[in-house]
Amino acid sequence: MGQCLRYQMQWEDLEEYQALTFLTRNEILCIHDTFLKLCPSGKHYKEATLTMDQVSSLPALRVNPFRDRICRVFSHDNVFSFEDVLGMASVFSEQACPSLKIEYAFRIYDFNENGFIDEEDLEEIVLRLLKSDDASEDLLMDVMHHVLSESDLDNDSMLSFSEFEHAMAKSPDFMNSFRIHFWGC
């Protein structure tokens, strides 16, 4: 791994990033420092990109069972610009609004990207949360049936965004569990 050119972030850029994200100045500067350490040699941070492997190997994501989906949802063309990284950190910050967190959670959990969280997606979510490919079929069916019976308001065996949003709004733990401190900031 190389290192980006050590350009100081311009004050105007810092103010703009702070206005456009839910991050504090210190968090932005901490993310900037980490990004500089990871990005290719000789590049200015605004032109540099990180690979999905670099981002998914960060300590906070390395242990997350959804790291590949998180990276896919937040990256552009499978690479991360500094602004992509800021956007991801902003959504997972404590200060991000519930509606934004719900929108991104839905996109992350929609594995087949069909615009719904269907049985295929629910099975993948459960398997990843259990960290097992050998969960019993009965357990998978029980969990999927429970989720759908609680959240599938139109009984079509899948969750639309509005159904998912309704379910997450009722979940007291959602806001606390949909947080990641990426940079040790």
Curated annotation (Swiss-Prot):
InterPro entries: CIBP, EF-hand-dom_pair, EF_Hand_1_Ca_BS, EF_hand_dom. Keywords: Calcium, Magnesium, Metal-binding, Repeat. Expressed weakly in megakaryocytes and endothelial cells. CDD domains: EFh (cd00051). Transmembrane segments: none annotated. Ca(2+) binds at residues 110, 112, 114, 121. GO terms for molecular function: calcium ion binding; magnesium ion binding. Pfam families: EF-hand_7. It comes from the Eukaryota. Residues 62-95, 97-132, 138-174 form the EF-hand domain. Interacts with ITGA2B (via C-terminus cytoplasmic tail region); the interaction is stabilized/increased in a calcium- and magnesium-dependent manner. The binding of either calcium or magnesium may significantly increases the structural stability of the protein in comparison to apo-CIB (calcium- and magnesium-free form). This is Calcium and integrin-binding family member 4. It comes from Mus musculus (Mouse).
